Amino acid sequence: HPIELDEIINAFNKIQNDTQIEDEIWKNDDILGWLYESYNNAKKQAFKDSKDKTEYDKVSLQSQVYTPKWVVEFLVNNSLGKLYLEMYPNSNIKNRYKIANAPQTNERNIKPLHEIKLIDPACGSGNFLLYAYDLFYELYMDQIDNFDADYEEKDIPKLIIENNICGIDLDDRAIQLATLGLYIKAKQNRRTITNLKFNVISSDFFLPDFEEVKEIFETSNLTSEQQKLVEDIWDDLKYAYKFGSLVKIGEKIQTKVESIYEKVKREGQDLFNTVDIQDYYLFEQTFFKNLESAVQKYASSKSNSFLVDKTSDAITFLKLVSQKYDVATANPPYTDSSDFGVDLKEFIDTNYKQPYKFNTNLYATFIKRCYELTDENGKIAMVHPPTFMYIKTFEDVRKFILDKTYIDFFVEWGYLGMFNPSARVDSAMYILSKAPNEKDSSFMKLNELYEGKRFDTFNVAYDDFLNKVQNKYNFTVPQSKLKIIKSYPFIYWISDEFREKFKSDSVENLLKNCQG
């Protein structure tokens, strides 16, 4: 794409010749992502002016927003950093990073650091991954220096890239920038490093039609129902280029197993449903091996090296969407359901409307997806518009969050002031934990401030919170109290006395409506 390359070079030159921009900007590890968003601005505006509906191939263009480094640091520190302190509460990490509600005692079973995984399912050019690399590096050094862990400093870059950080995005160019950024970081830490296997992948890969590989699965003695499930999953995988990490693979098998368990609850255990459960567990174990074999066999039969690479990417994608993570971070795309194109709407309604309605906005589907991708004690850290906090159509989202997660820290930012001036959006950022917790949830309310004052106010209020100093912008509330008001709006700042009024009967229940 020579024209696009020329545009990128011109963009670099404009910045380099701008006397108001300091030289230090070129030392920032997220400079590539920042430039890429600037490069896309004209295309974004053209799409916005077209008034077209947002289809899968325009999601990145329509809603790709560069996440400022301070936001990334806050979210990663309070998810990955806090998870580490839950295992090592006496670590020096708590003195070096600003982590809210840092535990004083061990709250989590110790897990080897090289087994802890973080994913960004809409990673763009990799801002979250780049900072996660830095924090993971510090955690490894803490393990070596203070906990006698059996790691060597020279191995840390490879451990982080091949074991700890994962990312998926629809945008192939953004993924290339994310991979390049991580490679540069690894090279800075160890200049001789080579042959890294990245778990950062574009879902824009190629798969053949199922008919071309079906014989691999036919040798597995599948039932007709299982054969149909294989075809459905293959189709989902084949069209991952449209929907990226929102595609569900392993969940379809798990849903089938759960339906058998529900049948057992209703009808009791018998030989047939016991065999069904055993069959599906065996099916699950062999399915992914067969799927990988099918992809590899197809790739090896082709002489086109590019096609082989793009087909092999499917194996990495399959692995990433099928495993569980300790932390999921995201600044997901924002698109209201009224702006969905036909294909996108059909996919979202099919996969994210039941049993809870997460189909009202694209960012809401990523809340659900991050929950699904994390393990039973995982953490979720996200930034996106705050519309889900109050609007009726997001009631199911709020109910899901309150029923199934613990709100650790929540910042209601408000309109403007978080992202660059061209991103005219409301924002909120928060950290959720899937592990049960009886502690009060912490909130910060900044949305009524003038946008230019929010950043400084945030820093002061956050420092006050960490130092247990009263601040009018900070609030704590038992999460259960957010369920008192009908439809569960996140109204966290009112007094208990006022909140209790919502427990009493409403006017329509107390008065009889009469005619005449």
Question: What is the role of each PLM region?
Answer:
Residues 46, 50, 86-91, 143, ...:
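Short, flexible/disordered secondary-structure transition segments
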Residues 136-143:
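Post-Walker A helix-loop "phosphate-sensing" segment adjacent to the P-loop in P-loop NTPases
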Residues 1-135, 164, 168-177, 198-326, ...:
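Preference for the N-terminal adenyl/adenosyl cofactor-binding alpha/beta module
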Residues 106-109, 154-156, 316-319, 400, ...:
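Short, flexible, glycine/charge-rich loop motifs used to bind or transfer phosphoryl groups or to couple energy/partner
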Residues 144-173:
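Cysteine-dependent PTP/DSP-like catalytic domain, specifically the C-terminal lobe
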